Amino acid sequence: MTLFIISIIVYLLSITLISTRALHMLQQNRYNRGYRYIKWIIKNIKETLLNYNLLFLVFIFTSITTNLNNISSIIFIVLLIFTDYVFINTRKKEHAKLPLKYTARIKRLMATNTILHLIPIIIMLITFNEESLSIYYLILGIMLILNHFITLLINFLNRPLEKMVGNHFRNKALNKLHSMTNMDVIGITGSYGKTSTKNVVHDILNIKYNVFKTPANYNTPFGLMITINEHLDKYNDYFIAEMGACKQGEIKELCDLVSPKYGIITRIGLAHLETFGSEEIIQHTKFELIESLPSDGIGVLNGDDEKQLSYNIKNDCKIIWIGIDNHKVDCYATDLELTYKGTKFKVKFKGDDKLHEFETKLLGRNNIYNILGGIALGKELGISLTDLQKAVKRVEPVEHRLSMTKYYDINLIDDAYNSNPMGCKMALEVLSMMPGKHMVVTPGMIEVGEKEYEVNKEFGRQIANSKTDEVILIGTEKTKPIYEGLIEEKYPESKIHVLNDVMDAFPLMMELKDKETYVLLENDLPDSFNEKIRSDKKW
């Protein structure tokens, strides 16, 4: 009995470690909205079902075929300690961009998870029989191996409770919004650029109005409800709501909650193609925002985006088109001048013969689109051109989104939070306009569904045809398409460096640098990379 109790204690430690990881992945995959968590399990089946857990299959076979109960207990304890050791060391090597947030929902899931795991243990302790040890360990071993699937089960079991909690917060948010009759809502959606556009529009409108925006990447129903219930106040003139989605109908759900009067679509691309299913569904979903606006509302659309130009809008609200290449729009930017300090450009409005000069600290065409959205909406809301010019000049770069920083004497163009094809292309444009030696550090693009190989290979071709002198690829398997794209375009193989650990990129960058060097940090690089920059950077 003593050995069994010890094995239970060690088992509970193992379950805690593995369950925390499973809950983290469930949270990252939006609690299985659009079956994202199920798809993650399938994609990572080696971690979720195989790998070192296979050792337990050996143990289970051994325990069934022997009657050596004490030895079975010792084997079970040793295997648990070994798996805990492997698990902890594996996690140390990984650095999550977003750590597990211990929200109320996660705590409720943890409670259900604890109950589910304690029930069989309590039954075993009450009905303890040494002859049944093999059966006990068989049950516990299977529960450990299937932990990610058990997490899926507890998410399902908690669904009625979460629906009740959601309805409570929703009603509270709706009542608060209905009481704020002097405040209008601005919705922002798109395949990418939502957070950057939200920040830019906020900074521009804030020069005249009291504007509140959703914090960080709060772009789900719960995120908006929390923002409304805990942060909005009666003095806000405008509330900017970032709207994210991974399946059709989710933008409409957000619009039904906050009733936006104004809407901005950034760009429509391949982000979350895996969960949407098709590019057409992505297009229709993003336009749920524009089609939810009232007849006296205003939509701001990108005239350089074919997906937006080709869509048949089912709404008679006012539409303002912005662009850079398309000069038939209502508001376009021209004469872009890029330096390491930022961008200068001119803006032309339809019906106005003058070109108006603007200056910003932001880099890249994507950021000019974001600024144009803010300028166009700000002008409609009565902000003078002089104030718009001042506001644009004051806009601060968003960290990890084409922001400039330093690592010793290396100039870093930090685009580590970008993960889309158009953004990658524009980031390379920014790099190519800088003086000195150029490097790219990237682990490649993810969450672009079945086109992941294709878009990463194209990214490799684009790097090869840019002014990039050295390429550092992080991860052998994920970056293989980029490597193939580089080689296909006859990029020198000696200039391609493939690393398994992102931390090895730092000494390599220092080794490869020249007197003046610019390094583009592109795509979903882990937080460890950003932490290394912050701790080591010298000014």
Where are these regions (language model features)?
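ATP-dependent carboxylate-amine ligase
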Residues: M1-L138, I142-R159, A376-L385, K390-W539
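N-terminal pre-Walker A segment at the start of P-loop NTPase domains
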Residues: I154-K172
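Conserved substrate/cofactor phosphate-moiety recognition/catalytic segment
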Residues: I207-K234
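Membrane-embedded segments
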Residues: T220-P221, M225, K247-E253
